[in-house]
Amino acid sequence: MFLDRDGVLIQDKHHLCDPDNVELCPGAQLLLEQAHQQGWPVVVITNQSGIARGYFDWDAYERVNDRLLELLGSAASVAAIYGNGHGPEAQPISWRKPSPAMLLAAAEDLNLNLRQSLLIGDRLSDLEAGARANLPLLAHVLSGHGQRERPAVEQWAGECAHSTSDNPGFELVLLESLLNFQPNLLGMQA
């Protein structure tokens, strides 16, 4: 299970660099606890352009991650966190989503089967990364930037479904929040 960090697991606060400002999104802890109980590895993938822009450094990024893990608790295990510190101008050679590079690296590092994985994100770029990594299930959540990006996500999914040259082979699930996620989508028992 791949999840974006800001706007999915934690409240999106523009260029968050202070661990005292980290707040979990509703349903984040429960979802990760359910995944852990069922043996599903959880990988966080996150774009952090604030590093490239000089708003914060890798140490501040790590402190925010540490606070996230502390708030989630031991019952909500995270296998790894992959972060990209490039800005939008770094495309297409960076790990920055929509590149699938972070997902592909995690699959190799952790021996994950991407065809048995899903991604939950709040931005179109999250879902594009999942599609480019050939994940079969993508979920878009309205938290974070999700409300603003939902129309673009729906348009993109429609275009992918009707494409003859690049049929994505994924299912898109639209969620209001992580509280609406149904573990049976993964074969998980809640």
Regions found by a protein language model. Give the residues of each.
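Asp-based, Mg2+/Mn2+-dependent phosphohydrolase catalytic module
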Residues: D59-A79, G87-L119, R123-A190
